[in-house]
Amino acid sequence: AIAGIGAAAGLIALTKAAIDNADELGKASQKMGMTVEALSRLQYAAKLSGVELGGLQTGMNALARQMAANSDAFGQLSVSITNSDGTLRSSVAVLGDVADRFAGMEDGATKTALALSIFGRAGADMIPMLNAGSAGLAAMAQESDNVGNTIDGKTAKAAERFNDTLSKIEATMGG
C-alpha cells in the first residue's frame, strides 16, 4: 500500500512538472515573440545540447535585440536579417542561418566571440546547439514532434489556467 502511495505521489509530481513546463513555455514564447510549438522544439534541441530554457531564452532575446540593432555580427557571418520587403525575418529563421555558419566554423575564439556578440551571455553555451546547423536543428525539432515533446499553444494555455487556478486556491487557503 505504501509503495502504491509513493508511486501515485511520483506520478502526481511528474504531471505537475509537465504542466509547469507547458505554462513556462507559454509565457516564455510570448516574451520571445515565437509560437509555443517553435519554442518547445528549440527547447528540446537546446536540452539535448546542454542548454536550459533560461539560457535559450536569454540567447534568443539577445538575438532579437541584435537583429533590431542590425549588429555587424550578422554581416560577418553573411546572414541576412531582413526579408525582401525590409522587415525583420523571424528569429527562428535567422537562428537556422546562424547555425549553418557556426557548423562550418572552427571552434575557437572567433566563434565564441561571435556567439557572445549575437546571443549575449548565453552565446558560448549555445555553441554546441548551433554546431548542429539548421539541418540538425530541424532533425531535433522533428524528433521532438515524434516523441511527443512538442507543446502546442492550446496545451500551454490550459496549463496556465490550471496553475492560475491552483494559485488562487492556495491564496484563498492562506498559502
Question: Which residues does each PLM region occupy?
Answer:
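Low-complexity, glycine/alanine/serine/threonine- and acidic/polar-rich repeat/linker tracts characteristic
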Residues: A1-K16, D20-D23, K27-E37, R41-V51, ...
